[in-house]
Amino acid sequence: MTPAPGSVADATGNWVDSIAPAWSRPYLRLSRLDRPIGSWLLLLPCWWSSALASVAAGERTPHLTQIVLFFVGAFALRGAGCSWNVIVVRELDGAVERTASRPIPSGQVSVAQAAAFLLVQALAGLFVLLSFNRFTVALGVASLAIVVVYPFMKRVTYWPQIVLGLAFSWGALMGWAGAFGRLDLPALLLYAGSISWVIGYDTIYAHQDREDDALIGIKSTALLFGERTKPMLAAFYGGAVVLIAAAGFLAQFSVHGGFVFAATLALFAAHLAWQIARLDIASPDNCLTVFKSNRDAGLILFAGLLLDAAMH
């Protein structure tokens, strides 16, 4: 299949290329709606946290309104974050084969147009955020500092994945705050577990570009870990499982629900172990496939939390 004009190298043949109006395609690519995996990975900690809060509150289901709001907010704010990232790193993107076709470095949109689109997406996210209680609104606003500094971290540290983890895991705090108007230890443990998960999967993602990154001075855990990537993934993924387990059991599962959660967590851990076994860091296609499978891992955990809540 011949890529559509202006399509991004690692996301060809998607709905944006095939059915979206031509004028909208650069903007949809700018917000990464041609590659929704990032929105899912931002959304899932929100859903985990909402489900965990419903367990702690003894409710059978999370509030449907919050589930929908988090869905809309995750796609809007991930789009805004991606737009900001592309604006900041546009010169670096232009020097990397996989990212040179992105809308700004390829000339499909100007920086001013991208900034205007960023503002539209940010306002949509703000509209969603204002639907929550005051504590949650303040918590959401606080996350902006992390989002702003993340694109610059690739130039100064081999651990930008930690900063990404802080940003992408923020939903693990938001769901609990949305339910209770405060933060408690289960939410903090869930947040820490999600950060460890993000560091793992984004290390996998970063292996796609490690050769280009090394040439132009972009740093990442993929370059730092190198051939030690698999044992390091085992450490971070293992930490994620332990921390999420602690969060779950502190949320006071029922006897039957505790069994369901333990079984679900075992499936989640098995999926992470499968990723490590399947991973071939020398193959960009393999890295992308394994990275994308984390949506399934996150949905497994969410399903288990929902089932436990329903058993109360």
Where are these regions (language model features)?
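Membrane-interface helix starts
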Residues: 32-42
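Intramembrane alpha-helical segments
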Residues: 28-29, 102-189, 271-280
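Small-residue-rich segments of transmembrane alpha-helices in multi-pass membrane proteins
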Residues: 40-50, 103, 164-179, 224-227, ...
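Multi-pass membrane catalytic core of lipid/isoprenoid biosynthesis enzymes
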Residues: 67-74, 90-140, 215-262, 303-304
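Helix-loop junctions at the membrane-solvent interface of multi-pass transporters
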Residues: 51-52, 130-132, 153, 177-178, ...
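Cytosolic, membrane-interface loops and tails of multi-pass inner-membrane proteins
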Residues: 2-27, 82-109, 203-226, 278-286
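Membrane-embedded alpha-helical segments that form the functional core of polytopic membrane enzymes
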Residues: 46-88, 98, 122-130, 137-148, ...
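Extended hydrophobic alpha-helices typical of membrane-associated regions
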Residues: 20-25, 242, 246-312
